[in-house]
């Protein structure tokens, strides 16, 4: 009996020891079982297979910004190309503005933090008690002037096709809509407006403003997860033609190439714009502060339409204001000469005139060195208080001096840091098109790593916040209950910045500087 008891005890101890060792096994196991099986679409090397495909969505959009009541109305025709080998009977369209609809579920599931200083409306919004209705008002969904059947489910809309789309088919349909633009300073948001009470004007940063096609791929079919505010998006690539109607004294910054500068700009502005295309040593001021201040006082009543085109991009965004100062500079990137440009109200000066376009230029140069040559015609930094947000060729960035124009080193370096980071997003995810709604680190972590390289290579003694081992120590020493693996859905990540930005960036810094060495790492990266 004693021997049996001793044997059982020994077995139990071995079992417990084995159980204690279990959490460590996955850290060192080979990745074969965790990686998808190679197929004709995606090879074992990670390269596209011989039958790789991706869908395409082309847009013809016309929108009008109402500066009197802060609304945006628009129409679009989407031409969807089914390049898949599968027949489609319905399409999914993203309606991101519906996160601000009055029946939105977003406030019920979003994580929020209440600090000592926060607008009352932002608290109300986080509690689902906001009376603002910022959702899309869909007026029609048609094809060949005939209505289509559609179902709206919060931030997603399913369109049922009258006739299935066979492989190789394309289908065009039109949507008309409008929505109330949100006050970013009161209720937050990735886009919206900021009101300046001293002069009675607005700066509009407009994004996710049109119904956008969802991704359909061989990996998971339709990517139709709801937009809850944190996890951003993945989108099919396509060609855009966009007309933006605004008050005639507004200056527009936008994704793409401006097609009608002679109609949108004054003669003097057009001349300066042309000069900027060959100015490699310093920015050219296209709209001066004096000109912008004059327009603040004398608001135009007529309108003008700015026309743009953008090829092979996944999204489109713009900014508009009569308050904008505008400068631009040419950058030599391989065989390309993109324009680095900045748009900012007088409240951003003198910091923005000194630093923004210079930071855009340095970012394009360094990211192109580590990845691929920047392929787009422009890269734009727009001044927008309290946010940092990116879209193809354009981003919205914080960093405002004091009212007297003074600013601290902290304000300066944080402003430069956010410009580098958001301009860098043109590479991750705008070109590689990773799915941040699913895996945030593949966007933010990769971008933060190259942001760190840009800061240390282009600026002397730059106080980088993320990317070095010493800056990640407090997080890694913290309560393990609040540390998540980087392969965590974006809506479930705790300590979002440390987990999705800093941890992957630091790991790659260690891999580059200590494990592999810069030469091998840079060749592989």
Language-model segment annotations:
Residues 103-118, 179-240, 260-261, 329-331:
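Glycine/proline-rich low-complexity spacer/linker segments in large multi-domain proteins
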Residues 211-222, 228-420, 449:
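Hydrophobic helix-coil surface modules that form long, contiguous segments used
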Residues 1-23:
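Bacterial Sec-dependent N-terminal signal peptides
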Residues 72-99, 104, 115-119:
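Ligand-binding face of N-terminal immunoglobulin V-set domains in extracellular IgSF glycoproteins
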Residues 24-42, 57, 308, 341-525:
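Hydrophobic alpha-helical and helix-loop surface patches within well-folded domains
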Residues 19-73, 207:
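N-terminal, polar/Ser/Thr-rich
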Residues 76-78, 82, 95-97, 169-183, ...:
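Short, hydrophobic/aromatic-enriched beta-strand segments in well-ordered soluble domains
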Residues 71, 81, 87-88, 118-196, ...:
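A surface-exposed beta-strand-loop module
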């Amino acid at each position: 009996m004693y021997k049996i008891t001793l044997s059982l005890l020994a077995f139990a101890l071995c079992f417990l020891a084995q159980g204690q060792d279990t959490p460590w096994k996955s850290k060192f196991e080979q990745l074969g079982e965790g990686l998808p099986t190679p197929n004709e679409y995606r090879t074992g090397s990670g390269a596209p297979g011989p039958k790789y495909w991706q869908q395409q969505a082309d847009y013809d959009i016309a929108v009008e910004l109402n500066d009197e009541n802060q609304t945006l109305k628009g129409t679009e025709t989407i031409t969807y190309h089914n390049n898949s080998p599968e027949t489609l009977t319905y399409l999914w369209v993203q309606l991101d503005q519906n996160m601000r609809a009055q029946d939105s579920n977003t406030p019920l599931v979003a994580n929020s933090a209440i600090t000592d200083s926060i607008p009352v409306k932002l608290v109300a919004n986080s509690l689902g008690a906001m009376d603002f209705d910022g959702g899309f008002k869909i007026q029609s969904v048609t094809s060949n002037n005939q209505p289509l059947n559609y179902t709206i489910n919060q931030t997603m809309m399913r369109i049922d096709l009258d006739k299935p789309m066979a492989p190789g088919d394309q289908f065009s349909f039109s949507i008309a809509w409008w929505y109330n633009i949100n006050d970013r300073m009161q209720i937050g948001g990735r886009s919206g407006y900021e009101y300046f009470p001293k002069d009675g004007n607005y700066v509009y940063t407009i994004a996710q403003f049109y119904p956008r096609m969802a991704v359909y791929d061989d990996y998971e079919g339709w990517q139709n997860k709801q937009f809850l505010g944190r996890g951003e998006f993945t989108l099919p690539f396509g060609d855009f033609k966009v007309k933006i109607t605004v008050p005639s004294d507004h200056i527009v910054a936008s994704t793409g190439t401006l097609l009608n500068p002679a109609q949108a700009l004054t003669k003097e502005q057009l001349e300066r714009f042309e000069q900027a295309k060959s100015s490699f040593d310093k920015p050219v001021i296209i709209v001066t502060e004096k000109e912008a201040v004059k327009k603040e006082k004398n608001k135009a009543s007529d309108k003008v339409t700015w026309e743009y085109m953008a090829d092979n991009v996944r999204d489109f965004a713009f900014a508009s204001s009569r308050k904008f100062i505008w400068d631009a500079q040419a950058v030599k990137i391989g065989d390309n000469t993109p324009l680095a440009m900045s748009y900012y109200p007088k409240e951003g000066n003198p910091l923005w005139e000194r630093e923004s376009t210079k930071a855009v230029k340095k970012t394009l140069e360094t990211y192109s060195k580590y990845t691929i040559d920047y392929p787009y015609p422009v890269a734009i930094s727009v001044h927008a208080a309290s946010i940092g947000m990116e879209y193809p060729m354009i981003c919205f960035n914080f960093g405002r001096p004091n009212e007297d124009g003074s600013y601290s080193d902290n304000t300066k370096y944080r402003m430069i840091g956010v410009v580098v980071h958001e301009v860098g997003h043109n590479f991750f995810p705008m070109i590689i098109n990773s799915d941040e709604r699913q895996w945030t680190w593949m966007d933010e972590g990769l971008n933060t790593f190259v942001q760190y390289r840009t800061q240390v290579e282009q600026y002397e003694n730059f106080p980088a916040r993320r990317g070095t081992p010493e800056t990640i120590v407090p997080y890694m020493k913290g309560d393990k209950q609040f540390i998540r693996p980087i392969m965590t859905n974006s809506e479930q990540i705790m300590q979002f910045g440390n987990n999705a930005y800093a941890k992957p960036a630091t790991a790659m810094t260690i891999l580059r500087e200590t494990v592999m060495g810069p030469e091998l790492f840079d060749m592989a990266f």
